[in-house]
């Protein structure tokens, strides 16, 4: 996973105890160090194909995601916008999963922390 904080800090590692209804989880960084992460401090949690990604990839957000649910556009407080699909968005929850509409991109799915967003639009 790639963990992006609201303060723009980025950490990479793995977790085996992240649950959307919990306020924190443990992250094992790529160097083996363990730490507790508080979800409210995050922008989003990115479940990625690789830690490096593809710097040459041009985001398209035009792909249809089979079984992905409703189309959603998320604008984060830092100005970044991601378009994808979700089956679990509710304005009453602290966050939700989405699958980006860019199947060739590095992100397989994203857990968006609602308090880090500026606008959320359903299509």
Segment roles from a protein language model:
Residues 1-123:
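Conserved RNA-binding domains used in RNP assembly and mRNA/RNA metabolism
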């Amino acid at each position: 996973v790639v963990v992006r904080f609201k303060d723009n800090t980025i950490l990479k590692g793995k977790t085996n105890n992240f649950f959307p209804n919990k306020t924190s989880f443990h992250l094992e960084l790529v160097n083996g160090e363990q730490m507790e992460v508080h979800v409210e401090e995050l922008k989003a949690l990115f479940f990625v194909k690789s830690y490096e990604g593809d710097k040459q990839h041009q985001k398209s957000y035009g792909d249809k995601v089979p079984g992905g649910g409703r189309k959603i556009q998320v604008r984060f407080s830092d100005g970044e916008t991601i378009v994808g699909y979700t089956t679990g968005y509710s304005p009453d929850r602290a966050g939700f999963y989405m699958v980006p509409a860019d199947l060739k991109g590095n992100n397989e799915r994203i857990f968006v922390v609602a308090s880090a967003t500026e606008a959320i639009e359903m299509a």
